[in-house]
Amino acid sequence: AKPNDMVIKTIVTTDMIDKIAAAYGIKCYNVLTGFKWIAELIREKEASENFVIGGEESYGLMVGSKLRDKDAVAAVAIISEMTAYEKEQGKLLYEKLIDLYVKYGFYKEHLISLTKKGMNGQKEIEQMMEHYRSTPPVSINGSAVTQLLDYEKRRGKNPQTGEEWNIALPKSNVLQFILADGSKISARPSGAEPKIKFYF
């Protein structure tokens, strides 16, 4: 890794990437969901920083800055190369993943999409988001909410101390709840379908 290398991921993608990047001294930037945001940040930073890899939780991957969108061919090539390298070391790729979990912590992600069809579907989704925004939970599954990130208002808040801060990303209808146990729960309406998505 070089000092000017960077990794870019979306805000709903595993925080394990941030931790690995930090261990290698690489900057890791978080952007809104969608590869257009990754490509835009590459353009903003390319004069001073070198984009290495980026992606989002929906299995999209971008390697290098030549093709600024999801690149399944490059992803398959990288996975094949990783598999071959680990085989030479006498390991399965799965065993390498376990090694990474042991070194950086165990991470598990899950996505739940709720479809709200019909004339009232979109309204129901808007009401759900407004409810979470106006009456955020104090705890989730027994763990205190330590940060509430409202990307529509571009504000973050620690509900326990009252401390507030700005979020330096474009406005987007996304809420994130960061819990004391390290969990992160994100809620956002789908841009293309009558769905609300919850990322755990």
Question: Which positions does each model-derived feature cover?
Answer:
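Phosphate-binding and adjacent anionic-ligand microenvironments
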Residues: 3-188, 195-197
